[in-house]
């Protein structure tokens, strides 16, 4: 039976950057990795209502720089920047170093797989029909400019006794093309019938790094000469 590789993992270093960018000695590596995990857990829990897509962590010169990518920067910053100061102090406490927090706004949340998956999960918790939630997400992404999108939900859909999976796709989603810019993410919806998993793939185009795509024109077949009678 065929298995699927993680769309983001296979593209790391090709079209996808790492979300933790730092180097460390062997003795410090495990501590840094653990503190990265703790920082992400804290910020994800604290900023549930802020539509956070990803958290990028850098460690320049015995300090830590955290960039929060969010569709609602006002919720993260708070009144006169008070909330950011609270976050910065807590991150510094977790890591034991000086911390800096940057906010990056996501201009098109309809094209961010994590935000789309979270949105569908929240709609399912509000008892919106899963087909309607999937179709709405797909239509919004295609309207904004996605070249393709696929959405899959799995679990006791509509309160059914037997769990199943359903998916909806529009456009093209070339998972085997490494230069394809595919954003992939998952989310969970905790309903009264159990947990429903949500997966989203969004194809935004191909990353060619200045190369011009070559389109081969079909070769014309030579005309056959009529047989001599």
UniProtKB/Swiss-Prot annotation:
Q: PANTHER family of this UniProt entry?
A: 30S/40S RIBOSOMAL PROTEIN S3, SMALL RIBOSOMAL SUBUNIT PROTEIN US3C
Q: Which domain of life is it from?
A: Bacteria
Q: InterPro entries from the xrefs?
A: KH_dom, KH_dom-like_a/b, KH_dom_type_2, KH_sf_prok-type, Ribosomal_S3_C_sf, Ribosomal_uS3_bac-typ, Ribosomal_uS3_C, Ribosomal_uS3_CS
Named from the GO MF annotations, one term is: rRNA binding
Q: What does the annotation say about its assembly with partners?
A: Part of the 30S ribosomal subunit. Forms a tight complex with proteins S10 and S14.
Under the cellular component aspect of Gene Ontology, which terms does the record hold?
Answer: cytosolic small ribosomal subunit
Annotated gene = rpsC
Matching entries from Pfam families are given as:
KH_2, Ribosomal_S3_C
Q: Which residues form a coiled coil?
A: none
Q: PROSITE patterns annotated for this entry?
A: KH_TYPE_2, RIBOSOMAL_S3
What name appears for this protein in its UniProt entry?
Small ribosomal subunit protein uS3
Signal as a keyword?
Answer: no
The record's annotation in SMART domains points to: KH
Q: Which family does it belong to?
A: Belongs to the universal ribosomal protein uS3 family.
> Its function?
Binds the lower part of the 30S subunit head. Binds mRNA in the 70S ribosome, positioning it for translation.
Keywords associated with the record = Ribonucleoprotein, Ribosomal protein, RNA-binding, rRNA-binding
Domain KH type-2, residue spans: 39-107
What does the record list as GO biological process? translation
């Amino acid at each position: 039976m065929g298995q699927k590789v993680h769309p983001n993992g296979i593209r790391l270093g090709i079209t996808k950057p790492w979300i933790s960018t730092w180097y460390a000695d062997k003795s410090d590596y495990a501590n840094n990795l653990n503190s990265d995990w703790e920082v992400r857990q804290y910020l994800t829990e604290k900023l549930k209502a802020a539509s956070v897509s990803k958290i990028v962590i850098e460690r320049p010169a015995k300090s830590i720089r955290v960039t929060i990518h969010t569709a609602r920067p006002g919720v993260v910053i708070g009144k006169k920047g008070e909330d950011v100061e609270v976050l910065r102090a807590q991150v510094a406490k977790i890591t034991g170093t000086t911390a800096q927090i940057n906010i990056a706004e996501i201009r098109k949340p309809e094209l961010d797989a994590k935000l789309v998956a979270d949105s569908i999960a929240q709609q399912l918790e509000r008892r919106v029909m899963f087909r309607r939630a999937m179709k709405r997400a797909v239509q919004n992404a295609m309207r904004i400019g996605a070249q393709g999108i696929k959405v899959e939900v799995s679990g006791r859909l509509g309160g059914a006794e037997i769990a199943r999976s359903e998916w909806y796709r529009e456009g093209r989603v070339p998972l085997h093309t490494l230069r394809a810019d595919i954003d992939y993410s998952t989310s969970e919806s905790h309903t009264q019938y159990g947990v429903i998993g949500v997966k989203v793939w969004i194809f935004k185009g191909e990353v060619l790094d200045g190369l011009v795509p070559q389109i081969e024109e079909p070769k014309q077949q030579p005309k056959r000469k009529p047989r001599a009678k």
